[in-house]
Each structure stands twice: as structure tokens, then as C-alpha cells.
From Swiss-Prot:
Gene Ontology CC terms: extracellular region
Predominant location: secreted
Record protein name field: Conotoxin Cal14.14
The species this protein was found in: Californiconus californicus (California cone)
Superkingdom of the organism of origin: Eukaryota
Free-text comment about domains: The cysteine framework is XIV (C-C-C-C).
Amino acid sequence: MFRLGVFLLTFLLLVSMATSEYSRGRIMARASECVNECVESGHNTFHCERHCSNT
């Protein structure tokens, strides 16, 4: 019974870590997409990074 509890806790921890890494990855990807679109419309990179980190 104790082993099962330890296993479940470990499993849940791994799942939550994977989920947060995944969502952080999605946010980073969205930010770089934003910067690329912004630069393409003629702004400089510094302005775009500031603009995209605010949204």
C-alpha cells in the first residue's frame, strides 16, 4: 500500500512537471511568433520583444 502511494506521488509530480514545461514551451513559441510577425511589419527587434512580452 505504501509503495503504491509513493508511486502515485512520483507519477503525479512527473506529469505536473511535464505539463508546466509544455505550457512554458508553448508560451515561448507564441512569443517568438509574435516577434517574427512584428519584425516583418517593419519594427526593430528590441521594440518587438518588449511589445510581445507585454501581451
